Amino acid sequence: MEPTKDETHAIVEFVDVLLRDGAVIQADVIVTVADIPLIGISLRAAIAGMTTMTEYGLFEEWDAAHRQQSEAFTTSPTADRRED
């Protein structure tokens, strides 16, 4: 009997690596008609977990503001009150 690898968890491993290490996608697209360039698009996207993003200096202010807002909401006296 030979060992086999379960392929059903490959997507989970991929997402784990993507969130932990991150990825940068860059694309340049030029739309032409009859060899005449009409539209130029330059795209750049960074995909990663928030921990990785803040380690690289991305979304630091956004993360800090949302953490502060969340902390203020959870410690407010109205957060513990339930509606009947």
UniProtKB/Swiss-Prot annotation:
Disruption of the gene: reported phenotype: Gas vesicles are only seen in stationary phase, not in log phase. Gas vesicles are wild-type. No gas vesicle production in H.volcanii.
Domain of life: Archaea
Motif (Conserved in GvpJ1/2 but not GvpA): 44-48
MF term (GO), any: structural molecule activity
Outcome of substituting residue 44 to E: Very few gas vesicles
Region feature (Beta-strand 2): 41-43
Result, substituting residue 11 to A/D: No gas vesicles
Main location: other
Expression triggers: Probably part of a gvpF1-gvpG1-gvpH1-gvpI1-gvpJ1-gvpK1-gvpL1-gvpM1 operon, maximally expressed in early to mid log phase. Gas vesicles appear earlier when grown in static culture, possibly due to O(2)-limitation.
Positions of the UniProt region annotated as Interacts with GvpL1: 1-25
Coiled-coil stretches: none
Annotated region described as Alpha helix 2, given as residue ranges: 46-56
Region (Beta-strand 1): 27-29
Keywords tagged on the record: Gas vesicle, Plasmid
Subunit description: GvpF to GvpM interact with each other in vitro, and may form multi-subunit complex(es). Might interact with GvpA1.
UniProt comment concerning the protein's domains: The N-terminus (residues 1-25) interacts with GvpL. A short motif conserved in GvpJ1/2 and GvpM1/2 (but not GvpA), which is predicted to be on the outer surface of the proteins, is important for the function of GvpJ and GvpM.
Family: Belongs to the gas vesicle GvpA family.
Additional record remark: Encoded in a 14-gene plasmid locus called p-vac which produces predominantly short, spindle-shaped gas vesicles during all stages of growth.
Protein name: Gas vesicle protein M1
Species of the source: Halobacterium salinarum (strain ATCC 700922 / JCM 11081 / NRC-1) (Halobacterium halobium)
